[in-house]
Amino acid sequence: MTRIRRGYIARRRRTKTRFFASSWRGARGNLTRAIIQQRIRAWFSSHRDRTRQKRDFRRLWITRINAAIRENGRSSIYSKLIHNLYKRQLFLNRKMLAQLAILNRNCLYMISNQILKEVDWQESATILEI
């Protein structure tokens, strides 16, 4: 069987994959078959880690908010803060609250103290009505 020389389309496809893998070390950056396998692995990892990154950032924000709230001194924890925020219909997401905890902690304290005052006032009002 005679050898068929491939045209420019196959060469263009291979050079495109080589540009994708130009920074990889060893055979993974030089050999076409190894590049293709490693590219599939890289796409899989990037897809998996995009969802993992969302999860990790959410955990980080929750940890920062909880640490800042516990420093406040009043008996408040993260879950109660979020519950009371939703009860008051203050829809501040966790990313915004974490930024407040880092950059402007006094503002976060004011928000949490105001919410706690309102909750205490309403609970005492319901006790008096009964």
Curated annotation (Swiss-Prot):
Pfam families to which the protein is assigned, alphabetical:
Ribosomal_L20
Leader sequence range is none
Q: Which GO terms describe its cellular component?
A: chloroplast; ribonucleoprotein complex; ribosome
User: What is any one GO biological process for this UniProt entry?
Assistant: translation
**Domain of life (superkingdom):** Eukaryota
rRNA-binding: is it a keyword of this entry? yes
- Describe the family membership recorded for this protein in Swiss-Prot or TrEMBL: Belongs to the bacterial ribosomal protein bL20 family.
Q: What does this protein do?
A: Binds directly to 23S ribosomal RNA and is necessary for the in vitro assembly process of the 50S ribosomal subunit. It is not involved in the protein synthesizing functions of that subunit.
What's this protein's name?
A: Large ribosomal subunit protein bL20c
User: What are the leading ranks of the lineage?
Assistant: Eukaryota, Viridiplantae, Streptophyta, Embryophyta, Tracheophyta
Q: Which gene encodes it?
A: rpl20
